[in-house]
């Protein structure tokens, strides 16, 4: 079913920039956090793809995910450098994974970030909610500057979903962008629940992107529905939206995320851009990032007819009028 989705769009596959691969002991704690009811969502969060690493990689490949992030993040000092070392090994044995890395506000952060970039890291993750830190911390100023200069994207969980942190919301990260306007930042989860404010940031800063992780799924729509009034803006920002899924830490089948996006009725060109072309441009031959491996098709493959990015056909109701079929939050055993 997943392969039928992207083949129907005339794509060579998917690029999912927001998946998680971590050392087994760390991932086990993440899974226990979600399944133990500590995520603050007031409902069950079963892990749909609780499988060994090799099986998770094989599943993404079977889905037709040609490139994927391998995001990981620390929750305390003296952890990021070790995570980066593990991530480098994962990237070496998983050529279709985007070599990912992370950081924490601590002495030496600039040094190990420079080392990771030099070793080939092409995507970073910052989790302001879990890390509980201020992104404007002076120990991170050189880190943000380095990422901006190298044009290496960083996925930032800066929205206040599923629960607010001391430094979530648009305010703190806006301070970083004001100081480093050339930073290539990807706002995780479309910035839920502050969708409009983070779309504003994308309008002000040309290198700010947003990923779709969990957005428009039945699960997130119950917690933080996307306002229908913002759909035209989402359509207009189509060249800045990237597919993300949160695989494997999702409580529904992978296909549900794709069907939720299709259910917005923003047109086939918008879906092609979001599900493949935007990330191929950002990380592939045209992105200046240096990861020149074949992506299985050019970025400009938008030949199928249908509405343009601005052809917003969503009518009435909230964006929570989710027309995606299947994939209820409890259907976690279906790929």
Describe these PLM feature segments.
Residues 1-17, 24-67, 237-240, 251-306, ...:
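Mid-to-C-terminal alpha-helical segments outside catalytic/metal-binding sites
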Residues 18-24, 157, 189:
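Histidine-centered divalent metal-coordination motifs
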Residues 25-30, 81-82, 112-113, 167-168, ...:
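Short aromatic-enriched loop/helix-cap "lid" or pocket-rim segments at secondary-structure transitions
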Residues 66-67, 74-168, 206-209, 217, ...:
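Active-site gating/metal-coordination segments in enzymes
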Residues 122-123, 133-242:
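Catalytic pocket-lining loop regions of alpha/beta-barrel enzymes
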């Amino acid at each position: 079913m997943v392969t039928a989705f992207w083949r129907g769009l005339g794509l060579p596959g998917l690029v999912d920039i927001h998946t998680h691969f971590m050392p087994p002991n760390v991932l086990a704690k993440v899974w226990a956090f979600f399944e133990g009811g500590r995520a603050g969502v007031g409902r069950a969060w079963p892990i749909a793809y609780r499988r060994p690493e090799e099986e998770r990689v094989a599943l993404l490949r079977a889905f037709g995910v040609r490139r994927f992030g391998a995001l990981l993040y620390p929750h305390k000092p003296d952890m990021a450098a070790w995570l980066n070392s593990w991530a480098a090994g994962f990237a070496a044995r998983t050529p279709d994974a985007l070599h990912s890395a992370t950081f924490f506000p601590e002495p030496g952060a600039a040094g190990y970030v420079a080392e990771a970039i030099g070793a080939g890291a092409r995507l970073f993750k910052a989790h302001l909610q879990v890390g509980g830190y201020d992104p404007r911390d002076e120990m991170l100023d050189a880190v943000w500057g380095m990422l901006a200069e190298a044009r290496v994207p960083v996925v930032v969980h800066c929205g206040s979903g599923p629960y607010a942190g001391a430094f979530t919301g648009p305010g703190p990260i806006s301070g970083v962008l004001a100081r480093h306007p050339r930073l290539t930042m990807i706002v995780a989860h479309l910035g839920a629940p502050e969708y409009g404010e983070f779309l504003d940031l994308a309008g002000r800063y040309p290198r700010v992107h947003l990923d779709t992780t969990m957005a428009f799924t039945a699960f997130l729509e119950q917690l933080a529905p996307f306002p229908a009034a913002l759909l035209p803006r989402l359509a207009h920002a189509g060249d800045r939206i990237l597919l993300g899924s949160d695989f494997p830490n999702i409580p529904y089948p992978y296909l549900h995320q794709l069907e939720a996006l299709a259910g917005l009725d923003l047109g086939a060109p918008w879906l092609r851009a979001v599900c493949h072309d935007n990330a191929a441009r950002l990380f592939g031959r045209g992105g200046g990032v240096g990861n020149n491996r074949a992506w299985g098709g050019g970025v400009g493959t938008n030949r199928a007819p249908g509405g343009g990015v601005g052809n917003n056909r969503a009518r009435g109701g909230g964006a929570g009028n989710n027309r995606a079929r299947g994939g209820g939050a409890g259907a976690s055993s279906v790929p």
